[in-house]
UniProtKB/Swiss-Prot annotation:
HAMAP family per the UniProt record, alphabetical: PGAM_GpmA (MF_01039)
Pfam families reported for this sequence: His_Phos_1
Binding locations of substrate: 10-17, 23-24, 62, 89-92, 100, 116-117, 185-186
GO biological process, one term: glycolytic process
Catalysed reaction equations from the record: (2R)-2-phosphoglycerate = (2R)-3-phosphoglycerate
Subunit structure as annotated in this protein's UniProt entry: Homodimer.
Gene that this sequence comes from: gpmA
InterPro entries for the chain: His_Pase_superF_clade-1 (IPR013078), His_PPase_superfam (IPR029033), PG/BPGM_mutase_AS (IPR001345), Phosphogly_mut1 (IPR005952)
Residue ranges crossing the lipid bilayer per the database entry: none
This protein's name: 2,3-bisphosphoglycerate-dependent phosphoglycerate mutase
Purpose of the protein: Catalyzes the interconversion of 2-phosphoglycerate and 3-phosphoglycerate.
NCBIfam families with a match to the protein in the record: pgm_1 (TIGR01258), PRK14115.1 (NF010713)
Organism: Enterobacter sp. (strain 638)
Amino acid sequence: MAVTKLVLVRHGESQWNNENRFTGWYDVDLSEKGVGEAKAAGKLLKDEGFSFDFAYTSVLKRAIHTLWNVLDELDQAWLPVEKSWKLNERHYGALQGLNKAETAEKYGDEQVKQWRRGFAVTPPELTKDDERYPGHDPRYAKLTDAELPQTESLALTIDRVVPYWNDTILPRVKSGERVIVAAHGNSLRALVKYLDNLGEEEILELNIPTGVPLVYEFDENFKPIKRYYLGNADEIAAKAAAVANQGKAK
């Protein structure tokens, strides 16, 4: 029986990843390193024999440009793509733009770990008159007030990612199409938690590295039977550890 596969990839390193700043819905681009990571992910997928029928990404350019570079390496730049805000990074509220290590020095490592990785913990929220509030951004003009976040926990991120998975992405996977999703650390953590039924403590320790393809294999009932990264295991572990350490005081 043919195994159904799904590929997830977190965007390559962004300019604010490089500066160790909380990014959330702020629309920063890839760093030079991030472009290289995205191209390397595409080459790795090509070398492993992957090709796709459809792609999904967020409305943030670090994920969009990652997908562009991946598909370019696969010689599939023509692939149909759907962009949705529901795949955006978790909204980090008033933390957006702040340096993570400096924030940890001010509030403590454990508080920042909870803000970054806690399941139901929300960072301090933005006010609606703050220029960072997404209601001021034309790409979100059709969203209702209830849909526009002032801050988000991982639990709230799950509330938008999982219905999008079930209603939009999964039916395409079930139809036999080969799908790739280029998104963000926390929108992908939300999906992994749901697919693998991870507990709150397990998801607290899950860190997804930038620019590394994550492959899911599903059984005939579309239940996950295997999840694995493509690439060198030691390098991937080091990248995941670096993600975990971003929120610690220096």
